[in-house]
């Protein structure tokens, strides 16, 4: 069993935010961080790794410097990082991004007992679409907005807490 985590490098909006004349983020002039919600998914994956003894693989699509983010995740305990990069992928919308990442995961190999985790949404777009679109492309069941992942024997179980 392995746990695959989809992660994204995003602009650090806690500091100075640079904006282009057209109102879009000037990403080139901003520092980057691991998307906070994706970090939650990584932490859940690492907790399951400790309980189940499985392998954790992080996937990202981005420019070559995103390799640094993957190295940071590996220092935290992720076993392997996969960077999908090509100049043509720059500026991809959520659909294109999810199709590309899903193809990378499919090529890497997904077994029937594997789990794919993704953070709720990225702070630079707030769409919450890529994770569910990856699951759909790979014909996998999905649970969104999971509040907790525990195990029942050797089977991970997800709980979603709904609030009114």
State what each model feature region is.
Residues 8, 26-40:
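Short, glycine-rich nucleotide/cofactor-binding loops
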Residues 69-96:
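A glycine-rich helix N-cap at a beta->alpha junction
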Residues 107-113:
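Glycine-rich phosphate-binding loop signature in dinucleotide/nucleotide-binding domains
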Residues 125-138, 142:
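Short Gly/Thr/Asp-enriched flexible loops that form oxyanion-binding sites at enzyme active sites
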Residues 1-18:
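Positively charged, low-complexity intrinsically disordered leader regions
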Residues 2, 53-57, 80:
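Residues at the starts of beta-strands that form the adenosine-phosphate
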Residues 38-49:
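Histidine-anchored nucleotide/phosphate-binding helix
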Residues 160-164:
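Conserved small/polar residues in nucleotide/adenosyl-binding loops
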């Amino acid at each position: 069993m392995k746990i695959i985590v989809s992660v994204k490098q995003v602009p650090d909006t806690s500091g100075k935010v640079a904006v282009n004349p057209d109102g879009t983020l000037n990403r080139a002039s901003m520092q980057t961080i691991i998307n906070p919600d994706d970090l939650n998914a990584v932490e859940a994956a690492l907790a399951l790794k400790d309980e189940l003894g499985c392998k954790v693989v992080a996937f990202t699509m981005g420019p070559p410097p995103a390799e640094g983010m993957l190295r940071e995740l590996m220092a935290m305990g992720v076993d392997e990082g996969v960077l999908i990069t090509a100049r043509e992928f720059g500026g991809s919308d959520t659909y294109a991004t999810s199709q590309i990442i899903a193809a990378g995961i499919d090529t890497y190999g997904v077994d029937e007992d594997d789990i794919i985790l993704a953070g709720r949404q990225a702070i630079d777009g707030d769409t919450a679409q890529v994770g569910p679109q990856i699951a759909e492309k790979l014909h996998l069941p999905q649970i969104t907005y999971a509040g907790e992942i525990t195990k029942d024997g050797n089977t991970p179980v997800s709980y979603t807490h709904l609030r009114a």
